[in-house]
């Protein structure tokens, strides 16, 4: 009996283009502002006019090196720029200044948490082949079609041309669409933590191209690689990979050839479609750019930049779980954006319990910030004020119900939770004698329910707890109230 063939396996790598958040472009002082009128941020260097010379923006080099360090890449002591030759309307010089065989950084990795549907969350280490600097191209707007073919005419906006990019090339270590999406998400998270890019996919600040093939099991040679473009969300990356995996497997099983090509993800139709044949490196005729000198980063400069790196999200996640006792879920949510993590840490530093603080921040406070499109810096309810509220709850001074009642006002105006509680008499009733008197009144008012409870209907204790909370406006100490009720009901 013939052995069963190994299961199909996808092999996926990502090329992630990160727009570096410098005020001026990579080789000129022209502005990088987004959303302005077309062709208002151009100059002779951007347009490649005769006699112009590019000069490397040193902030671009700093951001690229810091990004590379955060991705555990080895920084090259010497690297250079190359000209990548191709002809397209959005490329004014008819070549792109990039880095080919001597990039600024090589051989790194990041660790990602992957939550596949129906499976336990797992950690995966993804290799990174290189990071190199290059200039962005302009943008084409096609009339009558979403692509050049089929359009009646095209307009070119060169505002984006010359904006600095860091291209991050992963190794082919990804195996599912979910892994690809999580990897891209972690790259964006790291870049935002560093402050080198806003990572806004809708504005094109972060763009991902997927290279994908399938093969029969992990020991089989790689299949024919297909590149996918036009994915503007992490969800689109996952869905495009999943569709393409199925398409390629079906093609192999039906004898249809897979060609090396570039395909576009069609979000509306939820499929990939052929765009053009894929070029190889030789098609671009790379050669060193004669107008730009070699790039040298000294050991002292590297170490100075390394000392400025913040604590990165993966390190924070581990610390929150291991040192603060948070769940993996809470640690992940809190570290997704650096401002939220900074807010949380300020609350804990002010003396609040970490788990209670995490619950309030990831719940009501995050909902308020998101629905009102606020930054944490703009939030009137400052970390030390939230810490005060958490301490009131933790110390039994107020109930969670009371905290929820005063929270909307605090979120809108800020202020001292303790002052509000004292001024309005909202403190928790924790005096046993006072609670006993209230319980006696309550039992006297409900003799039938007391008789039913003593006859075996123990669930009625919940009724009495509810009535007690109603009578006290939610201010009764729940633990003490239950103890007194239990004792009184049993007679």
From Swiss-Prot:
GO terms for biological process: glutaminyl-tRNAGln biosynthesis via transamidation; translation. Its EC number is 6.3.5.-. GO terms for molecular function: asparaginyl-tRNA synthase (glutamine-hydrolyzing) activity; ATP binding; glutaminyl-tRNA synthase (glutamine-hydrolyzing) activity. Coiled coil: none annotated. It catalyses: L-glutamyl-tRNA(Gln) + L-glutamine + ATP + H2O = L-glutaminyl-tRNA(Gln) + L-glutamate + ADP + phosphate + H(+); L-aspartyl-tRNA(Asn) + L-glutamine + ATP + H2O = L-asparaginyl-tRNA(Asn) + L-glutamate + ADP + phosphate + 2 H(+). The keyword S-adenosyl-L-methionine does not apply. SMART domains: GatB_Yqey. HAMAP family: GatB. PANTHER family: GLUTAMYL-TRNA GLN AMIDOTRANSFERASE SUBUNIT B MITOCHONDRIAL AND PROKARYOTIC PET112-RELATED (PTHR11659), GLUTAMYL-TRNA(GLN) AMIDOTRANSFERASE SUBUNIT B, MITOCHONDRIAL (PTHR11659:SF0). Heterotrimer of A, B and C subunits. Belongs to the GatB/GatE family. GatB subfamily. This is Aspartyl/glutamyl-tRNA(Asn/Gln) amidotransferase subunit B.
């Amino acid at each position: 009996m013939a052995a069963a063939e190994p299961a199909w396996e996808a092999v996926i790598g990502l090329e992630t283009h990160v727009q570096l958040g410098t005020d001026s472009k990579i080789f000129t002082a022209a502005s990088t502002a987004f959303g302005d009128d077309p062709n208002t941020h151009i100059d002779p260097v951007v347009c490649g006019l005769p006699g112009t010379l590019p000069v490397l923006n040193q902030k671009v080099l700093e951001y690229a090196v810091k990004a590379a360090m955060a991705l555990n890449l080895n920084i090259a002591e010497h690297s250079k720029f190359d000209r990548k030759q191709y002809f397209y309307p959005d490329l004014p010089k008819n070549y792109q200044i990039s880095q080919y065989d001597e990039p600024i950084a090589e051989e790194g990795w990041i660790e990602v948490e992957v939550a596949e549907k129906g499976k336990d969350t797992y950690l995966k280490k993804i290799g990174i082949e290189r990071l190199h600097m290059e200039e962005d191209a302009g943008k084409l707007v096609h009339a009558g079609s979403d692509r050049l073919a089929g359009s009646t005419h095209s307009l070119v906006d060169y505002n984006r041309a010359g904006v600095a990019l860091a291209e991050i090339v992963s190794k082919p270590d990804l195996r599912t669409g979910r892994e690809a999406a999580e990897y891209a998400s972690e790259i964006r998270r790291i870049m935002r933590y560093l402050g080198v890019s806003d990572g806004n996919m809708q504005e094109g600040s972060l763009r991902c191209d997927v290279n994908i093939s399938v093969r029969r099991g992990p020991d089989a040679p790689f299949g024919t690689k297909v590149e996918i473009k036009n994915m503007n969300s992490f969800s689109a990356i996952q869905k495009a990979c999943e569709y393409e995996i199925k398409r390629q497997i079906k093609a192999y099983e039906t004898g249809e050839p897979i060609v090396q090509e570039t395909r576009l993800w069609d979000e509306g139709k939820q499929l990939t479609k052929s765009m053009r044949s894929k070029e190889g490196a030789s098609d671009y005729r790379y050669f060193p750019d004669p107008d730009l000198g070699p790039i040298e980063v000294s050991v002292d400069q590297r170490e100075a930049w390394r000392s400025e790196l913040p604590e990165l999200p993966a390190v924070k996640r581990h610390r929150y779980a291991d040192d603060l006792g948070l769940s993996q879920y809470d640690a992940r949510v809190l570290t997704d954006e650096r401002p939220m993590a900074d807010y949380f840490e300020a609350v804990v530093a002010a003396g609040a319990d970490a788990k209670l603080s995490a619950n309030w921040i990831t719940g009501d406070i995050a909902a308020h910030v998101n629905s009102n499109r606020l930054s944490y810096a703009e939030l009137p309810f400052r970390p030390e004020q939230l810490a005060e509220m958490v301490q009131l709850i933790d110390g039994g001074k107020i109930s969670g119900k009371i905290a929820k009642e005063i929270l909307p006002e605090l979120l809108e105006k800020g202020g001292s939770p303790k002052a509000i509680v004292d001024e309005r008499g909202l403190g928790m009733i924790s005096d046993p004698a006072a609670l006993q008197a209230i319980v006696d009144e309550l039992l006297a008012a409900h003799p039938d329910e007391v008789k039913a409870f003593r006859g075996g209907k123990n669930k009625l204790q919940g009724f009495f707890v509810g009535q007690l909370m109603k009578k006290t406006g939610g201010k009764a100490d729940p633990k003490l109230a239950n103890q007194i009720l239990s004792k009184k009901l049993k007679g």
